[in-house]
């Protein structure tokens, strides 16, 4: 037998398989990092040089932008500085315009006056529930007036309910020359008694408390009133409306009786033309 040959490093390298040799070679070579590869690629890429005309144009555009004030929010985006754009309208201006539109739609010439607010409570099994009651008078200032009341847990909601109820129950009152009542009248509700009287021009509204709100909303400029028996605003308002509902105009009386308005005025000493003029002024 032949003697075993001693294994040396040279012999091991010769007998190694090709795959192992390739793996050892890869381990021996240093690997490049990702940053190094990017830097190498940028260095190899040639830079594009600007022409003299392009450089001058860019410089002039930059100087012009620095000289002009910066606009915040344009017509396209509708930013806050631009006060709302034409396309989207999301800025402050767009919101304000929409709010103003709603206000114009709600403002239909009706006068709203808050007469009284009081706190109310309801006793339930778990305790007391507190709320608010509102009394509101509304009118158009041209002979129509109404009142309503509303209850809610919050004051604004109570006022809103009272206003809606008042708008539904408006009545028309005949006015003389558009400024005062045609004749005196009395009204009563509960313990409250109210007296209303016609007045000459320049008298003003001689009324206090809830009654003044009624005549201001009605459009009366001259009237004298008196209230006795109660200071409850609800009773005073109801008594005032009772007196106003009894108001009649000479025109309506003449129609019921089949006569002319001039005949009802009793102007025996006046001419027919003057009587007709007075009748036209007094009629609705």
Swiss-Prot record:
GO biological process assignments? translation
Instruction: Please tell me whether the keyword Electron transport is annotated for this protein.
Output: no
Q: Name one GO cellular component term.
A: small ribosomal subunit
Specify whether RNA-binding is a keyword of the entry.
yes
- Annotated coiled-coil segments of the chain: none
Compositional bias (Low complexity) = 14-23, 44-67
Tell me the segments the record calls region Disordered: 1-105, 246-284
Boundaries of each S5 DRBM domain copy? Answer: 110-173
**Task performed by this protein:** With S4 and S12 plays an important role in translational accuracy.
Q: How does it assemble?
A: Part of the 30S ribosomal subunit. Contacts proteins S4 and S8.
Which protein is depicted? Small ribosomal subunit protein uS5
What is the organism field in this record? Erythrobacter litoralis (strain HTCC2594)
């Amino acid at each position: 037998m032949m003697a075993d040959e001693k294994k040396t490093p040279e012999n091991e390298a010769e007998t190694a398989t090709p795959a192992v040799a390739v793996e050892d070679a890869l381990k021996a070579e240093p690997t490049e990092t990702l940053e190094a590869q990017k830097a190498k690629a940028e260095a190899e890429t040639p830079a594009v040089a600007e022409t003299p005309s392009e450089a001058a144009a860019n410089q002039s555009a930059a100087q012009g932008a620095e000289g002009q004030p910066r606009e915040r929010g344009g017509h396209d985006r509708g930013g806050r500085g631009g006060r709302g754009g034409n396309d989207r309208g999301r800025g402050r201006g767009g919101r304000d315009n929409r709010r103003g539109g709603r206000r114009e739609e709600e403002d239909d010439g009706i006068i709203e006056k808050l007469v009284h607010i009081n706190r109310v409570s309801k006793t339930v099994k778990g305790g007391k529930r507190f709320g608010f009651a509102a009394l509101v008078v509304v009118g158009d200032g041209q002979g129509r007036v109404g009142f309503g009341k509303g209850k809610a847990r919050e004051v604004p909601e109570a006022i809103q309910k009272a206003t809606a109820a008042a708008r539904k129950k408006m009545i028309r009152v005949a006015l003389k020359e558009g400024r005062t009542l045609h004749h005196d009248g009395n009204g009563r509700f509960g313990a409250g008694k109210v007296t209303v009287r016609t007045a000459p021009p320049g008298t003003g509204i001689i009324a206090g408390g809830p009654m003044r709100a009624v005549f201001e909303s009605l459009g009366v400029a001259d009237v004298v009133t008196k209230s006795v028996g109660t200071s409850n605003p609800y009773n005073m308002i109801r008594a005032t409306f009772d007196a106003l509902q009894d108001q009649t105009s000479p025109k309506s009386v003449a129609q019921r009786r089949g006569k002319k308005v001039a005949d009802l005025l009793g102007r025996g000493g006046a001419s027919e033309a003057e009587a007709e003029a007075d009748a036209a002024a007094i009629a609705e």
